[in-house]
Amino acid sequence: MKKYWFNSMLSNKKLEQKCGLSKSMDGLDALGHTSGSEETIRKDADKKIPSWDSYSFSNIHYLNSLFDRRNLWSLISDHTFLVRNSNGDTYSVYFDIENQIFDIDNASSFLSELPSYLKSGSNNSNYYYSYYSMYDTQSNWNNHINSCIDSYLRFEISLNSDIYSDIDSYISSFICTESTSSIENCTESTSSIENGNSSIKTSSSYFNRIEKSNDFDLNTKYKQLWVQCENCYGLNYKKFFSSKMNICEYCGYHLKMSSSDRIELFIDPGTWEPMDEDMVSIDPIEFHSIDPIEFHSEEEPYIDRISFYQTKTGLTEAVQTGVGQLNSIPIAIGVMDFQFMGGSMGSVVGEKITRLIEYATNRSLPVIIVCASGGARMQEGALSLMQMAKISSASYDYQSNKKLFFVSILTSPTTGGVTASFGMLGDIIIAEPNAYIAFAGKRVIEQTLKKTVPDGLQVAEYLFHKGLFDPIVPRNPLKGVLNELFQLHGFLPLNQD
């Protein structure tokens, strides 16, 4: 068992700063300075020091402890120390960290070793540091020893208080800016150990909720570079995302594609000829003009919304129609775009699809319609519902009378009036993996029937086993599958003899 003398001393400012220690020493003398403090210890040496069980802590004692950092690792084993408190009382402290043993006893047996220790003590304060704490329980002593070891380790790897302060201030400035008003519940947890004028504080900030803001948005700078997967939340590099057909490189999830990207996927380069591009909606029922006093809608007018999405997507409506070639096979194709008002079907969408089918009927072309829609457009009322019957009528003539080939491709989401009409009228109905396909959405069903809809009930894989459509085809082989289907039904490439 080794014996150590704990005396109070002043460490240099650099070391105090690195360890985050208080500079107040309560007027105690430094190690090796025997004018007063050594005499006080010797005078108080004869005082009776009770054991831990009988020692009274009603009067708070602040123990000024020193460790030689060269010998700090030896504290792991059992040792006995001579300790002097702020009142000048001396007593021996025995503790064993491994066995969690702690005891205080009379210090008289150590006094004979005091002069030799003071003479041999080092005058270099760089090897020492001072730690001030208030202890009133035995468990606090154990915490104190552990904190001393932790402080030593932080000092050894140069993680000083300046670095912590810089990191904290950087994080705070990065997340909690003065101009950001969208951060809520930003609380700071501060733990402190105080003794009079000195204290040690450790602060850490917890952010329970961070909302998006125009002044502060983590994605503002880099949102043009990455696309986040809806399934695994992985980041896909946007530059190569289109070449991968908007399929997540981590989990293989099929993300939404724009109508232009789908046309590029299906149609041979240089063969695309759009139809009815100049056809736009004109708010046929004047949706926001009825009873303006009683109608308290916070939404912008329908015409303004149309203009907004036209600017955002570069499209005139929620569907692109036209003719082109798929592996040199002439086809008529209509592709819905969910980015334009959720792909909702209004009078213009219905008219463009109807004209496409009629054109294919007259030219005996196969038809592909790619569905991505939330259903009928409510801003056009009954006119949007009429499109279901109009498209179905044109499809009947195309399929039943002319015996031509219609392929419907269901992507995520395909719901409402599109599902109830031409979406399910194809001779071959193809679905994409994990596509959300339904007539009424989950929320509508639960609110109407007051029943819980299980997760996955309206996903393509589940519906496939119920016979709702034909194959589930990923995007990679989809063009080849369509090519084989067309040739199987007698539609051959133009350049084939």
UniProtKB/Swiss-Prot annotation:
Main subcellular location: plastid
Keyword field contains Nucleotide-binding: yes
Positions annotated to bind Zn(2+): C229, C232, C248, C251
Keyword Zinc-finger annotated: yes
Catalyses which reaction(s): N(6)-carboxybiotinyl-L-lysyl-[protein] + acetyl-CoA = N(6)-biotinyl-L-lysyl-[protein] + malonyl-CoA
Cited InterPro entries: AcCoA_carboxyl_beta, Acetyl_CoA_COase_Trfase_b_su, ClpP/crotonase-like_dom_sf, COA_CT_N
Cofactor dependence: Zn(2+)
Its EC number(s): 2.1.3.15
GO process terms (BP): fatty acid biosynthetic process; malonyl-CoA biosynthetic process
Pathway given in the UniProt record: Lipid metabolism; malonyl-CoA biosynthesis; malonyl-CoA from acetyl-CoA: step 1/1
GO CC term (a single one): acetyl-CoA carboxylase complex
GO molecular function: acetyl-CoA carboxylase activity; ATP binding; carboxyl- or carbamoyltransferase activity; zinc ion binding
Signal peptide: none
Zinc finger (C4-type): 229-251
Entries under Pfam families matching the protein: Carboxyl_trans
Cofactor note: Binds 1 zinc ion per subunit.
Quaternary structure note: Acetyl-CoA carboxylase is a heterohexamer composed of biotin carboxyl carrier protein, biotin carboxylase and 2 subunits each of ACCase subunit alpha and ACCase plastid-coded subunit beta (accD).
Record PANTHER family: ACETYL-COENZYME A CARBOXYLASE CARBOXYL TRANSFERASE SUBUNIT BETA, CHLOROPLASTIC (PTHR42995:SF5)
Function, as annotated: Component of the acetyl coenzyme A carboxylase (ACC) complex. Biotin carboxylase (BC) catalyzes the carboxylation of biotin on its carrier protein (BCCP) and then the CO(2) group is transferred by the transcarboxylase to acetyl-CoA to form malonyl-CoA.
Annotated protein name in UniProt: Acetyl-coenzyme A carboxylase carboxyl transferase subunit beta, chloroplastic
